[in-house]
């Protein structure tokens, strides 16, 4: 099962109104929420919007329009910004007229926790030194990850389409399945699988059932991605009008290409049906 939704165009800040401040010893507090409209936007692929310092003014994280469609090259003043690699690492450059370039680099290791949205690590400015994204007094936290625009309104972020196909005209909605693997292009995005590879899709690869003390447990292994979280969905039958019920335990992906997890279902039943639900980080 694959769930998700998209917004299009420019986004208001994704930063929490209560957890919004970074700190630098030589610059003071920096507000990532800013005025709520022009504040920082942490995206699935790139960051955009502005952060604000009372001492140096507005600092741009990027314009949300990288030349290649999915990530800033950071090789020119017209194509700069902070990239998100999808697994939490933030790399690239921010810029402010009164502070110059701010480097999101490996030594400071700026990153965002995909499960909590909390930013951590440090960013570097040649003019003011290190800026901490979290400390004992304050943290920066994003409430969501902006998927980016969807110009062709097919339910797939343009940035993901450019990443996968270098175009936005190849993948489509209405059940279109570019690689013919039985999984639609939209579902491939929601699971972050390759829409051009028929062997790459979200699927259960192993399943076993345990009965002990009249209780039932299922152990499932499925294909997984480091960019997604998962939940078990359960149904007792496939009769008309049946529904799946989600077990509200968020399962992080294991290292590697598959994840194995146990679902304890309580009192054993005559039959049960299970499926795996893929979730974008911080999605409802």
Task: Outline where the language-model segments fall.
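Short, composition-biased motifs enriched in small/polar/acidic residues
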Residues: 148-284
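Peripheral, non-catalytic segments of secretory and membrane proteins
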Residues: 4, 8-150
